[in-house]
């Protein structure tokens, strides 16, 4: 009985190490590919929708702020206007 438990635990240990190694190998290939992927996604990060001129202050009207931000009149800074979506 003890021998079968030891053998079972040894097999489970070997399977765990094998699965972990396979996962690390797969994750490693993702990390090698990610810089190229990020460069191809560059146009998304530089879209017009994300360009904010007055994100942290200096606004005078709501149109100075980014989407979903509104100009707070007391301190003249952009803050969330409470809306969702595009």
Swiss-Prot record:
Disulfide bonds join 52-66, 59-71, 65-78. Its main location: secreted. InterPro entries: Huwentoxin-1 (IPR011696). Expressed by the venom gland. Keywords: Amidation, Disulfide bond, Ion channel impairing toxin, Knottin, Potassium channel impairing toxin, Secreted, Signal, Toxin, Voltage-gated potassium channel impairing toxin, Voltage-gated sodium channel impairing toxin. It holds the Pfam family Toxin_12. GO terms for molecular function: ion channel inhibitor activity; potassium channel regulator activity; sodium channel regulator activity; toxin activity. It comes from the Eukaryota. SUPFAM superfamilies: omega toxin-like. The modification Phenylalanine amide is found at residue 84. It is found in: Secreted. Residues 1-21 form the signal peptide. GO terms for cellular component: extracellular region. Residues 22-50 form a propeptide. Negative results: does not show effect on Kv1.1/KCNA1, Kv1.2/KCNA2, Kv1.3/KCNA3, Kv1.4/KCNA4, Kv3.1/KCNC1 (all expressed in oocytes), voltage-gated sodium channels (Nav1/SCN) (from DRG neurons), and in a range of voltage-gated calcium channels (expressed in rat DRG neurons). In addition, does not show significant toxic symptoms when injected into mice and into cockroaches. This toxin acts as a voltage-dependent gating-modifier. It inhibits the sodium conductance (IC(50)=124 nM) and slows the fast inactivation (EC(50)=1180 nM) of Nav1.5/SCN5A. It significantly shifts the activation to more depolarized voltages and decreases the deactivation of Nav1.5 currents upon extreme depolarization, but only slightly affects voltage-dependence of steady-state inactivation. In addition, this toxin causes an approximately five-fold decrease in the rate of recovery from inactivation and an approximately 1.9-fold reduction in the closed-state inactivation rate. Belongs to the neurotoxin 10 (Hwtx-1) family. 28 (Jztx-11) subfamily. The presence of a 'disulfide through disulfide knot' structurally defines this protein as a knottin. This is Kappa-theraphotoxin-Cg1a 2. It comes from Chilobrachys guangxiensis (Chinese earth tiger tarantula).
């Amino acid at each position: 009985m003890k021998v079968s438990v030891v053998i079972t635990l040894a097999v489970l240990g070997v399977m765990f190490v094998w699965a972990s190694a396979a996962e690390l190998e797969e994750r490693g290939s993702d990390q090698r590919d990610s810089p190229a992927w990020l460069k191809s996604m560059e146009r998304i990060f530089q879209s017009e929708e994300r360009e904010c001129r007055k994100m942290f202050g200096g606004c005078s009207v709501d149109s100075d702020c980014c989407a979903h931000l509104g100009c707070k009149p007391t301190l003249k800074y952009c803050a969330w206007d409470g809306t969702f979506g595009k």
